[in-house]
Amino acid sequence: MALQKFPLLGLLFLITIVVSSTIAVDDPVCPTTSKLSRASFPNGFVFGTATAAFQVEGAINETCRGPALWDIFCKRNPERCSGHNADVAVDFFHRYKEDIQLMKNLNTDAFRLSIAWSRIFPHGRKEKGVSQAGVKFYHDLIDELLKNGIIPFVTVFHWDTPQDLEDEYGGFLSENIVKDFREYADYVFTEYGGKVKNWITFNEPWVFAHAGYDVGKKAPGRCSRYLKGCEDRDGRSGYEAYLVSHNLLNAHAEAVEVFRQKVKGGKIGIAHSPAWFEPHDLKDSNDVPTVSRVLDFMLGWHLDPTTFGDYPQIMKDLLGHRLPKFTSSQKAKLKDSTDFVGLNYYTSTFSNHNEKPDPSTPSWKQDSLVAWEPKNVDHSAIGSQPLTAALPVYAKGFRSLLKYIKDKYANPEIMIMENGYGDKLKDKDSVEVGTADYNRKYYLQRHLLAMNEAICIDKVRVTGYFVWSLLDNFEWQDGYNNRFGLYYVDFKNNLTRYEKESAKYYKDFLGQGVRPSALKKDEL
């Protein structure tokens, strides 16, 4: 048995003890159970899995689908898309009925999907044509989910701006996107709002703005040439990310205004993606405040406006004229413009005060006056990181982040829209190696326990949890070798799906207790 394949086996005994111990909490909404399972959570708690259109659908030349931002980015920069083949992806477009059966096999209650803008409006605007075949595909998908007792959660925008809008005016760099996004959101709410009641306007606005327009790692790959790896790029780091986010937030507010007119009894939010941070040096008076400062820049950047109507004060103070300003009417639309806080959590790191920022080379990370450190002052890593893990594993940070949101934002409803573990596998690795994902199983155990503690001990109002992802898929600039799925996809042999150990665990976890669909309305 190779340690490289199973680097966390040494922790198996400890983790088994932790997750199997009795959860004894004096709280009627948190039942006492002999081991951690669905039964350990409040009645009506929703468990599911998640994907995104560009990452799984494929079929880029079907339904009159127009080119999207990532299509062109990968075509122009193949080295940054690591084996990208969007026409195949994992072919969810043709195999969704098969994959819905995988969801049923897991005993899940819900499924988070996204609607590809360019599959509905191939050229970005209704007046330029609507693909009725694209519209029908999402109707068929949603109907199949409902037929199988699975609740659809739909993301309106998961990083797939129609390329025509990108070419016409720069996409989210222009305030023109606000009007076009409102039109698109209006259309999908009208079309699907009768049977879909749970919506997310934007997925991970921090990643979209920072990675796409500040460091250039993701589409459209814009950044200033003074940053490493950006020597041949166009862009303006330290400026464009804030402009993109400003337009995105105003687009969100406009979409929510339409949503509340069109979708009765529904809920809508944004899926945020902060890490958690621990101070690099607890004895350094400069390091401790870095945690709240970097979270204001990472989470508060988009959560403060949709809660309070404006950006965090620290961002205004440090950025000055580089941070756009909302009008009074925009603030009014943004305030309380979400019904829940969507949260994508994966990992944590250490935050170190940046003593000497260079004002001539602005960037988002430097602007927060925080350097991210993999180890603290004592040279200790945060959590654990198996040899094949994409990111450090730190479940304590998950609980800390949930409590932070409760305390700072007046205990809002929170839904975990993504939580998952990435394995960096090689092309030569076999299906047997890929499905023996014990590290992912342990990751899920530890994070489900941390979430249970946040709910039952810290009294955080978490109401749902989605594993990323149902299937191995295209992980943006990391391509296909970075696998997050509960089901292994054999990219060499007809994209065949195989159940992983983590899927078996999740199925067993969800097999104990009562599914929300089995409860009467007065019990929810």
UniProtKB/Swiss-Prot annotation:
This protein's UniProt keywords: Disulfide bond, Endoplasmic reticulum, Glycoprotein, Glycosidase, Hydrolase, Signal
Signal peptide: 1-24
Major subcellular site: endoplasmic reticulum
Disulfide bonds: 223-230
Binding locations of a beta-D-glucoside: 55, 158, 203-204, 346, 418, 468, 475-476, 484
Origin: domain of life: Eukaryota
Catalytic machinery residues: 204 (proton donor), 418 (nucleophile)
Tissue expr: Expressed exclusively in roots.
E.C. code: 3.2.1.21
Residue ranges crossing the lipid bilayer per the database entry: none
GO cellular component: endoplasmic reticulum; endoplasmic reticulum lumen; mitochondrion; plasmodesma
Pfam families cross-referenced by the UniProt entry: Glyco_hydro_1
GO molecular function terms listed in the Swiss-Prot or TrEMBL record: beta-glucosidase activity
Reaction(s) catalysed by this chain's protein: Hydrolysis of terminal, non-reducing beta-D-glucosyl residues with release of beta-D-glucose
Motif (Prevents secretion from ER): 521-524
Glycosylation-annotated residues: 61, 494
Up-regulation conditions: Up-regulated by salt, 2,4-D and methyl jasmonate. Down-regulated by cold and mannitol.
One GO term (biological process): cellular response to cold
InterPro entries assigned to the protein according to its UniProt record, in alphabetical order: Glyco_hydro_1, Glyco_hydro_1_N_CS, Glycoside_hydrolase_SF
EC top class, as a word: hydrolase
Documented activity regulation: Activated upon binding to PBP1 or PBP2.
Localisation per UniProt entry: Endoplasmic reticulum lumen
Complexes and interactors: Component of the PYK10 complex, at least composed of PYK10/BGLU23, BGLU21, BGLU22, JAL22, JAL23, PBP1/JAL30, PBP2/JAL31, JAL32, JAL33, JAL34, JAL35, GLL22 and GLL23.
PANTHER family, alphabetized: BETA-GLUCOSIDASE 21-RELATED (PTHR10353:SF266), GLYCOSYL HYDROLASE (PTHR10353)
Similarity comment text for this entry: Belongs to the glycosyl hydrolase 1 family.
The name this protein goes by in its record: Beta-glucosidase 22
Species of origin: Arabidopsis thaliana (Mouse-ear cress)
Gene that this polypeptide is encoded by: BGLU22
